[in-house]
């Protein structure tokens, strides 16, 4: 259901237009905080549009999702995280009630009208699905976009190869996902007794999968600690693996690739222009502030500035 709606974004070319317009405006200014001015906007606008969150509420929703699972400036636990999570749940509870009364062409309406074995999904089931979608639909793509600019800035040879067209945007997207690995870990419950590298695991034990470690596994990746955009094969686990593979992987890849294409088309290069700050989180890793100075390809940018 969600993937069908995501593919509709691609068909309408809305996402490409959004990414190019946001990047063009930033490049035209010459400098921006890429994390705040570009990467924070594209995934959130996209997932909010899919869910049916109106434009006037999207800035509010961005502030909630960022507070719910990470913090830009507080290393200690904050009650704001609990409050943000509760506010997200309450917001979608209100949306579910509205959509059941007046369905629209969005994911919340689709969930509200869905049945399993003839029974409609409960409000709790719909709200928790929306909660997962809004958080997952923002964080991975946003943090990977930010990391891609940082990684290209610190690996100019890789940027040059991408700018020349030596490497496809598809390959580059997979490598920035592997390199960024924004979701640090997943928990999995063993369904039977087993063993992992000599450690006995009993049925019912919870095993933590560390994505960053897996994506640097020297048995899988040659030169795992190098950012190489022509890496092939690239069997990373940025979106997890198996039955719990990220449902939003298709959309995240599309968002990241559109930003990379816009960077290639609108800039000859870019550099870090100030202190880089990282987020505080037990679940995610990434950058919260990335000041960037662009070298524009002027003619193309001027035509697309908002």
Which stretches of residues belong to each language-model region?
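Cytochrome P450
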Residues: 1-306
């Amino acid at each position: 259901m969600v993937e069908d709606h995501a593919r509709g974004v691609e068909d309408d070319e809305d996402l490409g237009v959004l990414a190019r317009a946001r990047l063009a405006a930033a490049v035209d200014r010459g400098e921006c905080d890429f994390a705040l001015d570009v990467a924070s906007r594209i995934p959130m606008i996209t997932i909010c549009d899919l869910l049916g969150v109106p434009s006037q509420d999207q800035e509010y929703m961005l502030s909630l999702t960022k507070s719910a699972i990470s913090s830009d400036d507080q290393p200690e636990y904050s009650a704001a995280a609990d409050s943000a999570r509760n506010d997200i749940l309450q917001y979608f509870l209100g949306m579910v009630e509205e959509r059941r009364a007046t369905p629209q062409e969005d994911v919340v309406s689709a969930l509200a009208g869905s049945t399993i074995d003839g029974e409609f999904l409960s409000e709790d089931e719909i709200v928790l699905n929306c909660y997962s979608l809004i958080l997952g639909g923002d964080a991975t793509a946003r943090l990977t976009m930010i990391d891609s600019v940082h990684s290209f800035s610190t690996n100019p040879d890789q940027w040059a190869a991408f700018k020349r067209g030596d490497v496809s945007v598809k390959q580059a997207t997979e490598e920035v996902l592997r390199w960024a690995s924004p979701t640090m870990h997943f928990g999995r419950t063993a369904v039977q007794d087993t063993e992992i590298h000599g450690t006995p695991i009993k049925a019912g034990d919870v095993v933590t999968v560390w994505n960053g470690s897996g994506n640097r596994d020297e048995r899988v990746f040659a030169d795992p600690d190098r950012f190489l955009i022509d890496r092939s094969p690239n069997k990373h686990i940025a979106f997890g693996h198996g039955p719990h593979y990220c449902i939003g992987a298709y959309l995240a890849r599309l968002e990241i690739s559109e930003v990379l294409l816009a960077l290639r088309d609108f800039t000859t290069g870019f550099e870090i222009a100030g202190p880089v700050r990282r987020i505080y989180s037990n679940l995610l890793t990434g950058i919260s502030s990335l000041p960037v100075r662009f070298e524009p390809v002027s003619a193309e940018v001027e035509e697309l500035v908002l």
